Design a protein with these regions (language model features):
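NUDIX/MutT-family hydrolases
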Residues: 85-87, 95-130, 142-145
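Conserved hydrophobic "DFG−1" position in protein kinase catalytic cores
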Residues: 11-12, 20, 88, 105
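The catalytic Nudix box helix
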Residues: 31-66
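Active-site-adjacent beta-strand/loop module that shapes the phosphate/pyrophosphate-binding cleft
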Residues: 69-95, 127
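Conserved N-terminal beta-strand and adjoining loop/helix that marks the start
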Residues: 1-18, 35
Length: 147
């Protein structure tokens, strides 16, 4: 199986919501980010992609590493993605640019929509919340905290 390497940024609002984007010609929402250019490391790619996709200028030292995760690619059937993910407070003004067709704020503690990229739904959100997807499903189903 082919592997695609990407960088992404969790932009979190003061209320805990995180920004998701949908790229033109796709149906899945994901984090802002993308593939590094030749010679570019994960951090530099994350900064560049946020500037290109959202018009926001982040500095490398302002990003905090969440982790590196591997799962099925959202828009490339038969591929896996390895994503290095960073976090940053959401800037006040973000607007779709470049290939971004739509922005959507997401409450990661609530029920997750079905149109999220696997990297975001299966790996990143559980990592930032500190619990597994299975544990979240149990909580949502029972309406109570896990034991």
């Amino acid at each position: 199986m082919s592997v695609i390497t990407v960088s992404g940024v969790v932009l979190r609002a003061d209320d805990g919501a995180l920004l998701t984007v949908r790229k033109r010609g796709t149906s899945r929402f994901m984090l802002p980010g993308g593939k590094p250019e030749p010679g570019e490391d994960a951090l530099a790619a994350a900064v560049r992609e946020c500037r290109e996709e959202l018009g926001v200028d982040l500095t490398p030292e302002s990003l905090e590493l969440v982790g590196t995760f591997r799962t099925a690619a959202a828009n490339e059937p038969g591929h896996e993605v390895i994503g290095t993910i960073f976090t940053h407070a959401a800037p006040p003004d973000v607007a779709p640019a470049a290939e971004i067709a739509e922005l959507r704020w997401l409450d990661p503690t609530g029920p997750l929509p079905d149109d999220l990229a696997p990297l975001l739904a299966e790996r990143v959100i559980p990592a930032i919340l500190g619990r597994s997807t299975v544990e979240r499903a149990r909580v949502a189903h029972r309406g109570s905290s896990p034991i």
